[in-house]
Amino acid sequence: VRSRRDTLPGMAELGLAAWPPAPIRTERLVLRASEARDRAAFVELFASPQVGAYLGGPRTRDDLERSVPDVPGRRPGLFVTELDGAMIGMVTLDRRDADRPGHIRADAGEVELGYLFLPDAWGRGYAAEACAAALGWFAGAVPGEPVVLCTQTANVRAMRLAATLGFIEVERFEEFGAEQWFGARSSVTPSG
């Protein structure tokens, strides 16, 4: 019997295997569950003004040092992205909150892709590589289940990455005081 915390929140009905899966290896990266050694990188990630620019701003390092657990991010749906043995970011797959705008289903609850990377990792294709690996894993675990992504239209890099990953615009709306781009991606890959 699996406990709720061993499966992706709200995704048990999709028949997902217990969390975490075996580490996912790409050409340059490893996607894996969080470990205690990742704590400093989590603090750095959430304290970064560049990372927080489109997320409501950074949190203070003091607040993070007090609040980040010994093993941060240890939850279903969160992959730490590792390069050469060190955390450089994270990729998440979560259920989109039904109370937020942006849905492709009448009953809401779509799986939403999220990601954050340390600024030193930007511009090298790591986010695309890690997100593609997480999406590939998810497509294998739950064939045919669509995934959504939401980002500020001002975040040009995120908009480019969404297109690279195959997300198609569904709508735009105002949220958090900014215009948001909302897209969807089918896990069904066209053959040819």
Residue ranges and their predicted role:
Residues 120-128:
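A short helix-loop-beta submotif of the ANL/AMP-binding
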